[in-house]
Amino acid sequence: MSTHRPRIAVVGAAAAGLAAAEGLRRLGWDGEIALIGDEPHLPYDRPPLSKQILSGAWEPERTALRDTEQIAALGLDLRLGTRALAYDPARRVLTLGDDGHTELRCVGVIAATGVTPRSLPGTDGVEGVHVLRTLEDACALRRRLATPGRRLAVVGTGVLGAEAAAVARALGHEVTLVGTGDTVMERVLGAEVGGLLADVHRAQGVTLRTGQAVTGVRAEAGRAVGVVLADGSTVEADDVLLAIGSDPAVGWLRGPGAGTAGPDLTDGLRCDEFCAAAPGLYGAGDIARWYHPVLRRELRIEHRMNASEQGLAAARNLLAELDPERFGERRPFTPVPYFWSDQYDLKLQAHGVLTGADRIEVRTLGKDPLRLAALYGGDGLATGVLAIGLPPRRTRGLRALIATPVPWPEAVARLADAVDA
């Protein structure tokens, strides 16, 4: 008789994967848990990479989410520095890229492999060209910024690019922020609030080249010396940070065995409201595109809080699928999404969904344009709210505005009451 315990594999050893593994144990799973990550590190926190690590305020080890004793207490089959190559959903067999291409037979898999940063053609191996996704990425750019007086070109005006530009400028470097939008973080914040944030960067000494596409990196002797813009001009730089978005890390789910009946991998791993992509296969974190039944739309959210919350939800629902008598019924994953960004002395906090809004209402607190609340909506409903420079009490109160869908006129009236209270 076989003595093997049933195994659940969690593929991805960052915040979502850790939350899933911890959730499985906390909820009572006594079978094996394989936690597989392609980086050599124990699970660590990514948001500090573009802030405290890049600035030098933290040493790398401070990003660890758990220490070795806490990880050991989970009783995991921990496989770090190991890449998943393929998953066969019919056989429930996971293939790993270590020596011999190990196959793991699983009763369930939680996919939490996150995203991979985009690059530009012809930049592989060019000294001074950076992306910012891993601890090694952050430490490499940090070492470059330890030399005073460098010129940094940041390509991409989203959250990552804006945060990195703020850190580099605070360190005293010459920073140029280049993007195709007209403002900073425009896709998320909209033109009005994005314009205010762009003014903050300019006031801090950042040069903005907005409405500009980058066609390539100019290199001499294998080293970056600038970026070339679509208008033919060049931004001279000693270092170039590419913050031009990312792609869901779903390649291993396309591997042998997935076949034509495999999961939908368009813009991530498509999941239902329970985070399930197929029987026994669940998604969590940046990789997961799931249906939010309260908001009645599909979402894929690349934010830290969502990663942890969805990791736990995926664990709970996988267990409920495997043994409903023991673990109960599955529950829809219906969070109120949250993210924050620190730039200079500003803290931006957002609840709900801001992207894709067709209307935005901005209310300032007093005469300071950088103490504000902004309401975001679509299809006649309020969907998200942003706070900049507001006290915690007011920020917490704003979340209630969009926790459930509210008609736009009612939400606008409540926004005024919340800000003026």
What are these regions (language model features)?
Residues 4-6, 289-392:
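Mid-to-C-terminal Rossmann-like scaffold of FAD/NAD(P)H-dependent oxidoreductases
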Residues 12-16, 38, 133-134, 155-160:
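Glycine-rich Rossmann-fold phosphate-binding loop(s) that bind the pyrophosphate
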